[in-house]
Design a protein with these regions (language model features):
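Domain-level signature for soluble enzymes in the chorismate/prephenate branch of the shikimate pathway
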Residues: 1-274
Length: 274
């Protein structure tokens, strides 16, 4: 299966993809919109995108692209994020002076930098890209922070593993397909939707009451601005159900009282990947 991912080979998206589809042919894309275009054009059969980190929060651009694109979520899964200090072969920990990585990864390793004041963190566009650049540079005073997949992809040396501040660091990923090609999972128990309501008192409360009336487990709600309409919002909701008849009942009732409703996916709730 051809799967599009955002970023360089060796990224956490790469690592997550191989854990669920070990034989996948990866299509790395520089930007997130390219990932979605790759799926919609048929260049890729599916895409794997990060949607939320347990520490840094949501990847808001991906919520917008989900809403705008004719794709649906087929699966979700979570990956434990382990950050590693990676350098060119022959490098030594005590010689490192500059450390490259994505700003989120750098922020999640503050204790490591506090313990190594001689190292200067430097933002880079991508964790795996930082490793690729470091290995190509060949400067033994430069290192990068990324997952172990990046070290394997670019023959980097792991100088220190597990340098993240918080071991309870997980990222949720979605496996997406074109809407017409999604395979419905028999054990689906989680639904993602987007909806908007009129900007007047009580409309959002009334919409949320629908979930309570059907005894769903509302596990996430997030708002995003409507592009071109200041102070208007789209609400993204994840909810879990025990009865397979509930999702359609919820959607039907929401459609009667909301301006718009879009189902983003009906899939099995995630299991944690180590």
């Amino acid at each position: 299966m051809r799967i599009a991912i955002q970023g360089e080979l060796g990224s956490f998206s790469h690592q997550a993809t191989l854990q669920i589809e070990p034989e996948a042919i990866l299509i790395p894309c520089a930007l997130s919109p390219e990932v979605f275009r790759s799926v919609l054009s048929g260049e890729a059969d599916a895409a794997v995108i990060p949607i939320e980190n347990s520490l840094a929060g949501s990847v808001v651009e991906h919520f917008d692209l989900l809403f705008q694109s004719d794709v649906r979520i087929e699966r979700e899964f979570s990956l434990r994020i382990r950050h590693n200090l990676i350098a060119a072969p022959g490098s030594k920990l005590e010689d490192i002076r500059q450390v490259l990585s994505h700003p989120v990864a750098l922020a999640q390793c503050r204790r490591f930098f506090a313990a190594h004041p001689a190292m200067t963190p430097s933002p880079f566009y991508d964790t795996a890209g930082a490793v690729k650049h470091t290995i190509e540079l060949g400067d033994r005073a430069v290192a990068a922070i990324a997952g172990e997949q990046a070290a394997r992809a670019y023959n980097g040396l792991v100088l220190q593993a597990g340098i993240e501040d918080n071991p309870a660091n997980f990222t949720r990923f979605f496996l997406l397909r074109r809407s017409a090609q999604v395979h419905q999972q028999p054990d689906a128990d989680k639904v993602s939707i987007a909806f908007s309501v009129k900007n007047r008192p009580g409309t959002l409360v009334a919409a949320l009451q629908v979930f309570a009336d059907h005894h769903t487990n509302l596990c996430k709600i997030e708002s995003r601005p409507v592009h071109g309409q200041p102070w208007e919002y789209i609400f993204y909701v994840d909810f879990q159900v025990a009865d397979p008849a509930v999702p359609s009942a919820v959607l039907q009732q929401l459609k009667r009282q909301c301006l718009l409703v879009k189902e983003l996916g009906y899939y099995p709730a995630a299991r944690l990947l180590s």
